[in-house]
Amino acid sequence: MNFKSVVLCILDGWGNGIGDSKYNAISNANPPCWQYISSNYPRCSLSACGTDVGLPDGQIGNSEVGHMNICSGRVVMQSLQRIDREIKTIENNKNLRSFISDLKDKNGVCHIMGLVSDGGVHSHQKHISTLANKISQHEIKVVIHAFLDGRDTLPNSGKKCVQEFEENIKGNDIRIATVSGRYYAMDRDNRWERTIETYEAIAFARATCHNNVMSLIDNNYQNNITDEFIRPTVIGDYKGIELKDGVLLANFRADRMIQLASILLGKTGYTEVAKFSSILSMMKYKEDLQIPCLFPPAFFTNTLGEIIADNKLRQLRIAETEKYAHVTFFFNCGKEEPFSNEERILIPSPKVETYDLQPEMSAFELTEKLVGKIRSQEFTLIVANYANPDMVGHTGNMEAAKKAVLAVDDCLAKVLNTVKEINDAVLIVTADHGNVECMFDEKNNTPHTAHTLNKVPFIIYPNSCNNLKLKDGRLSDIAPTILQLLGIKKPDEMTGSSLIV
């Protein structure tokens, strides 16, 4: 096979759900283009969670994991799995020893901030409690700045997570000093006012004060405020960060920590910056932040983007703000700089409080740009991400999710019709994980806002090869399939297999 171009459309959070479920936003929306391509073009299903994507067995997938597996053509051991394995001997880590030594010398307090959640997408609470306990054993006072989840977990699971966390730190000089919903603490869409609200609570204890974490959470629940949206709050007599203190950023996923880390380091326009002695992060967040980390990044060679570049071919990555990092940084397996002949287009996400208020997000603007680029026939590989199914799925709003599905479906029809105009072009429609196909948790009688364990679709429209047969596989099989379609030899590093039978 020697097609001239491949358009890879990643419908973020669009999984294979139960077709007749009243909680499946896809089937309930009756998207016409989707129904047509599902019935008329070659299709298979891909595993997007657990050990098939380098996560612990039974762990939900996510966008970072999904995009890395898609581009690398191999199962990538993920941060959660790696840290689970290595944190048992973390006291031998050179950067941690240096961090502890500095705190001891200055008699400083260790400020650990991160998502206290068992979701395993951005962090894991057991990693945070392990670090806190190990540092506390050096007779260092530890305070926790707890971010609450409710997005990769059930909306009201924060209380249980905090209870378990406090049980695990009991007996050491460790306490929770501030609490903040991730909506504020972990913004990645340049809503700096949210990040600043969290920062001011952490740095200066400038926020509403509450005496007890559990009663704070209960009060919010009673007012129908779920974990994600709890406003930054100071607990007890916490006074803020001092010059002698150290800061440890405990989330292992980078994209939702960059804004907070940037303010902490004075790398934004925000001028009131608290001084501290040392800083450490769980993983590398961003090159220009220059924060020492506990777990340096793994390096990958012969990823899909690299192979396209090495063959002197052009490629395009396009997404709106919420998923831009996924089609660039994560799709390049942690490489920030574009490859040679790699063009990137960022479409701003709408400035709304939550995306159920504008479920179409910026999909139509993205599609207008995408269609023009397909018609230009400049690119051998185009990677596009539609954020709507995931971002609106996370709100738990079924009606909005159906609107998001229909908006993406309308865009997909435009993309398909454009690809049909081009000779020797292929359209692949797939997803990185599930979400929008399950909008309610009957067991817990609550909206389902997290990702799912469902497989994801893989549909291919080849302009001149309608008898193509596909086999089921996993996300790491996508890159080898694309290379086969382009007539490019798969490198040895890609252990995935082409889905084409």
UniProtKB/Swiss-Prot annotation:
Residue spans crossing the bilayer: none
Residues that coordinate or bind substrate: 122, 151-152, 182, 188, 253-256, 323
Listed GO CC annotations: cytoplasm
Cofactor comment: Binds 2 manganese ions per subunit.
Keyword Isomerase among UniProt keywords: yes
Residue sites binding Mn(2+) 2 per the record: 12, 63, 432-433
Cofactor(s) this protein cannot do without: Mn(2+)
Signal peptide: none
One function term, GO molecular function aspect: phosphoglycerate mutase activity
Active site per database record: 63
Superkingdom as given in the UniProt entry: Bacteria
First-tier enzyme category under EC: isomerase
Reactions accelerated catalytically: (2R)-2-phosphoglycerate = (2R)-3-phosphoglycerate
Record keywords: Glycolysis, Isomerase, Manganese, Metal-binding
Pathway listed: Carbohydrate degradation; glycolysis; pyruvate from D-glyceraldehyde 3-phosphate: step 3/5
Record carries keyword Translocase: no
UniProt-listed NCBIfam families: pgm_bpd_ind
Record note on quaternary structure: Monomer.
UniProt family annotation: Belongs to the BPG-independent phosphoglycerate mutase family.
Function: Catalyzes the interconversion of 2-phosphoglycerate and 3-phosphoglycerate.
Record protein name field: 2,3-bisphosphoglycerate-independent phosphoglycerate mutase
